[in-house]
Swiss-Prot record:
It comes from the Bacteria. One of its GO terms (biological process) is UDP-N-acetylglucosamine metabolic process. Gene3D superfamilies: Glycogen Phosphorylase B (3.40.50.2000). This is Polysialic acid biosynthesis protein P7. On the 2D-gel the determined pI of this protein is 7.38. Disulfide bonds: none annotated. The gene is neuC. May be involved in the synthesis of polysialic acid (PSA). Pfam families: Epimerase_2. InterPro entries: UDP-GlcNAc_Epase, UDP_GlcNAc_Epimerase_2_dom, WecB-like. NCBIfam families: NeuC_NnaA. It comes from Escherichia coli. GO terms for molecular function: hydrolase activity, hydrolyzing O-glycosyl compounds.
Length: 391
């Protein structure tokens, strides 16, 4: 039996990969363990480890990295705790592969620890660009430590190969999240209202994270957004979902809570992925800078008002409206999203991240990988036409 460890650090990433984990758990020749860290272990972000426990996965390791303060220095301390904890863990626990998704700093620490113990890494969602965040260089660094790559578009597959990864180790399966939006059983509006209260006919969902490399302060970023939303306070309802634990997220959390209290809008620290998708499905659109607005929401035929540069560089479909972090621009974006012509565009648009059978293909590729001899040295793949000659 082959052993795989999946390490999860956030509610969003776990929601994307949960169906994959379920299918791997049900595969007879695989023993699947989970290690839980990051936001899952913090009350300020919903203590979402309970969701994983309810799903009955075998949690073999829990690492609380203390992320209730989000300065650059504190995040570096959290990364150090994570690196040391998983370094010790891998000294006493061997796996045929460690699987991770995305680009968060705690996952970076896990990837380093696994690599130093010569455990093959499987990386999901590599090759993507997010230019206004340190996620950008973290993601590409994880790619260089990984031996199997499951990308979400053909463009990202090419970029992973451009980083020197062998083409035979890189597979474009599409996004599991884009497939989830169409395949998961989503609650209906009445079921949502039993959990979260009455949903008005005209409401937006808002998810806003810090731009960690921006020259604009987090204070200014969130102030511009809230000023724009207040413009619609008499015509629309707004449901805010808590932000990721990035540098400055505690500032966003504090200001959003105060804003919601003042205008009687709802603030939810965290919700299950099915509820999140359903809440957006019945809404007027998603406002903010979450990657879900580009990857999952287009499958629901709902508009995304994507704010700022957090997602700059990512592939996007016609349902996405890009605006800078500036009040008047955000107001214009919200108004465009409600225009009948644009709604028609959204309804007829396709999701560039969707590819049929993403889940089935992911399981097949992972099974083939762990059965193969993957302990060989990683070689750097030189793209022939990019090799410089000095002759």
């Amino acid at each position: 039996m082959k052993k795989i460890l999946y390490v999860t650090g956030s509610r969003a990433e776990y929601g994307i990969v949960r169906r994959l984990l379920t299918m791997l758990r049900e595969t007879p020749e695989i023993q699947l363990d989970l290690a839980v860290t990051g936001m899952h272990c913090d009350n300020a972000y919903g203590n979402t480890i309970h969701i994983i426990e309810q799903d009955n996965f075998n949690i073999i390791k829990v690492v609380d990295i203390n992320i209730n303060t989000t300065s650059h220095t504190h995040i570096l301390h959290s990364m150090s705790v994570c690196l040391n904890s998983f370094g010790d863990f891998f000294s006493n626990n061997t796996y045929d592969a460690v699987m991770v998704l995305g680009d968060r700093y705690e996952i970076f620490s896990v990837a380093i620890a696994a690599s130093m113990h010569n455990i093959p890494l499987i990386h999901i969602h590599g090759g993507e660009k997010t230019l206004a965040n340190y996620d950008e260089f973290i993601r590409h660094s994880i790619t260089k430590m990984s031996k199997l790559h499951l990308t979400s578009t053909e463009e990202y597959k090419k970029r992973v190969i451009q980083l020197g990864e062998k083409p035979g180790s890189v597979f474009n399966i599409g996004s599991l999240g884009a497939e989830n939006a169409l395949s998961l059983h989503l609650p209906n509006k009445q079921e949502l209202e039993l959990k979260y209260g009455s949903l008005l006919k005209r409401y937006f969902v808002v998810v806003f994270h810090p731009e960690t490399l921006s020259t604009q302060s987090v204070n200014d970023q969130i102030d511009e957004l809230l000023s724009a939303i207040s413009f619609f306070k008499n015509t629309h309802d707004f449901i805010f979902i808590g932000s990721n634990a990035d540098t400055g997220s505690d500032i966003i959390q504090r200001k959003v809570k105060y804003f919601c209290k003042e205008y009687k809008f709802r603030y939810l620290i965290s919700i299950r992925s099915e509820d999140y998708l359903a809440m957006i499905k019945y809404s007027c659109g998603l406002i903010g800078n979450s990657s879900s607005g580009l990857i999952e929401v287009p499958s629901l035929k709902v508009a995304t008002i994507n704010i700022g540069d957090r997602q700059k560089g990512r592939v996007r479909g016609a349902s996405v409206i890009d605006v800078p972090v500036e009040k008047n621009a955000i107001v214009r974006g919200i108004n465009i999203s409600q225009d009948e012509k644009f709604i028609s565009v959204v309804q007829s648009s396709s999701n560039p991240y969707f590819k049929e059978n993403a889940l089935i293909n992911a399981v097949r590729i992972i099974k083939d990988f762990i059965k193969s001899k993957n302990k060989d040295y990683k070689d750097f793949y030189d793209i022939p036409e990019c090799t410089t000659s000095y002759d």
